[in-house]
Amino acid sequence: MLATAGSLIATIWAALHLRTLLVAALTFLLLADYFKTRRPKNYPPGPWGLPFVGNIFQLDFGQPHLSIQPFVKKYGNIFSLNLGDITSVVITGLPLIKETFTHIEQNILNRPLSVMQERITNKNGLIFSSGQTWKEQRRFALMTLRNFGLGKKSLEQRMQEEAHYLVEAIREEKGKPFNPHFSINNAVSNIICSVTFGERFEYHDSRFQEMLRLLDEVMYLETTMISQLYNIFPWIMKYIPGSHQTVFRNWEKLKLFVSSMIDDHRKDWNPEEPRDFIDAFLKEMSKYPEKTTSFNEENLICSTLDLFFAGTETTSTTLRWALLYMALYPEVQEKVQAEIDRVIGQKRAASLADRESMPYTNAVIHEVQRMGNIIPLNVPREVAMDTTLNGFHLPKGTMVLTNLTALHRDPKEWATPDVFNPEHFLENGQFKKRESFLPFSMGKRACLGEQLARSELFIFFTSLMQKFTFKPPTNEKLSLKFRNGLTLSPVTHRICAVPRE
């Protein structure tokens, strides 16, 4: 009897001891989270969040750029959010955006990294690097893009040739409904591939199509709720299956693809006659064998992938939006085609020199970019040193998000902000630049491929409008609904390309 009682007391004591330990551990974690995420003095206001996850569950990850807009109304043009253990501020409105990217830009040149992004890139490449690595890689990429045709007739001719291949690929659909996603992806990607890899890929190349599919999947899965939970609880989530694991597997396959291309280049590499970005990078690596710079194998792979991603996804997505808007706004499409027929006709290819004579087509492309809004919160920046913005204190390490969604739909800036209206970019029949139009961001970390993207958009869009009229399939309703990922892209759809001849 006494033994039984003793055993019971021991069990109760052990349970109480375990509970005490759990309570103590939880209290410690809560206090640690509080001190880590508490708002410093004069910090921008914002909604209170939950321990550990912050404001994550107050955002709709299907449309985070829209779910933050009520906070603008409540807290003003600068407010704070806690995204897990990442403290961030969101800036809204043209005056504040200009102040941020002019007066204090030197203090926010760094790139914040989620746990997932750091594991993928190890702080290498063009997009997610900071400091000296970013400076070296960006300077080299800009120089190399210029050396291999950016702004020159040779690259324009490649665009014209690729536009011809795309037209022929779409012509094979014979006006029947088809999904334009990967044919457009392939065409756009071939331009940057000609610069990075020194070659283009056929539209039926199964290996390259697989790379495009992997890239598309990464773009989408990196922003899912499960992936965000990995960023908050990596020590737990690394053992749990989910979209984050697919991202890591896909990224490794993409790295292997680029590595194989690099190996092929090494077989017949001539440092005196570089053929493309990879050759030029290998030459730069040979200058610094002691690895005293960022020119190493890992950065070669990451920078090549960054060019591949940035040179494919953004322009391709914009073109897909453009075809969708043309099918939904046939009166706009007719005006574009009338301008093409008047300036170019049907017997020659579109050239960049035509752009000045085609204000309406140029305005339509810009309006597609405004409404498509493919990078709605800009690519984030990180505060590199304690900074003051608009009277508020931003501590080192704060992530800065730019509310391009609100800017591109601001009723103070646009006559009909929520309506597709090319007249926003026209004045007295001539094309008009708009200060409140920032699809490529601004400042020192603005898109380094802006000139290339603008050229591609004009050549590809004009070439497609010259040869086809795009229409919704019979008995199928087209929608402007989007799929959220690293970019906002149209939901999967089919469209008809009816030959104009």
UniProtKB/Swiss-Prot annotation:
Q: What GO terms fall under cellular component here? A: cytoplasm; endoplasmic reticulum membrane; intracellular membrane-bounded organelle
Q: Name its pathway.
A: Lipid metabolism; arachidonate metabolism; Cofactor metabolism; retinol metabolism
This protein's membrane topology, according to the annotation, is:
Multi-pass membrane protein
Subcellular localization is given as: Endoplasmic reticulum membrane; Microsome membrane
Catalytic activity, reaction form: an organic molecule + reduced [NADPH--hemoprotein reductase] + O2 = an alcohol + oxidized [NADPH--hemoprotein reductase] + H2O + H(+); (5Z,8Z,11Z,14Z)-eicosatetraenoate + reduced [NADPH--hemoprotein reductase] + O2 = 19-hydroxy-(5Z,8Z,11Z,14Z)-eicosatetraenoate + oxidized [NADPH--hemoprotein reductase] + H2O + H(+); all-trans-retinal + reduced [NADPH--hemoprotein reductase] + O2 = all-trans-retinoate + oxidized [NADPH--hemoprotein reductase] + H2O + 2 H(+); 9-cis-retinal + reduced [NADPH--hemoprotein reductase] + O2 = 9-cis-retinoate + oxidized [NADPH--hemoprotein reductase] + H2O + 2 H(+)
Record GO biological process: arachidonate metabolic process; organic acid metabolic process; retinol metabolic process; xenobiotic metabolic process
A GO molecular function term, named singly, is: oxidoreductase activity, acting on paired donors, with incorporation or reduction of molecular oxygen, reduced flavin or flavoprotein as one donor, and incorporation of one atom of oxygen
Enzyme category, top tier:
oxidoreductase
Give the EC number. 1.14.14.1
Q: What residues bind heme, as annotated?
A: C447
Give the protein's cofactors: heme
Which tissues does the record link to its expression? Expressed in small intestinal enterocytes (at protein level). In the intestinal crypt, expressed at higher levels in the mature villous cells than in undifferentiated crypt cells (at protein level). Expressed in liver, kidney, lung, and olfactory mucosa (at protein level).
Could you list this entry's UniProt keywords, alphabetically sorted. Endoplasmic reticulum, Heme, Iron, Lipid metabolism, Membrane, Metal-binding, Microsome, Monooxygenase, Oxidoreductase, Transmembrane, Transmembrane helix
Annotated membrane-spanning segments are 12-32, 77-97
User: What is the purpose of this protein?
Assistant: A cytochrome P450 monooxygenase that may play a major role in intestinal retinoid metabolism. Catalyzes the oxidative transformation of all-trans retinal and 9-cis-retinal to the corresponding active forms all-trans and 9-cis retinoic acids. Catalyzes the hydroxylation of carbon-hydrogen bonds. Hydroxylates arachidonic acid predominantly at the omega-1 position. Mechanistically, uses molecular oxygen inserting one oxygen atom into a substrate, and reducing the second into a water molecule, with two electrons provided by NADPH via cytochrome P450 reductase (CPR; NADPH--hemoprotein reductase).
What is the similarity comment for this entry? Belongs to the cytochrome P450 family.
Q: Which PANTHER family match?
A: CYTOCHROME P450 2J2, CYTOCHROME P450 508A4-RELATED
UniProt name for this protein: Cytochrome P450 2J4
Q: Which organism is it from?
A: Rattus norvegicus
Q: Which gene encodes it?
A: CYP2J4
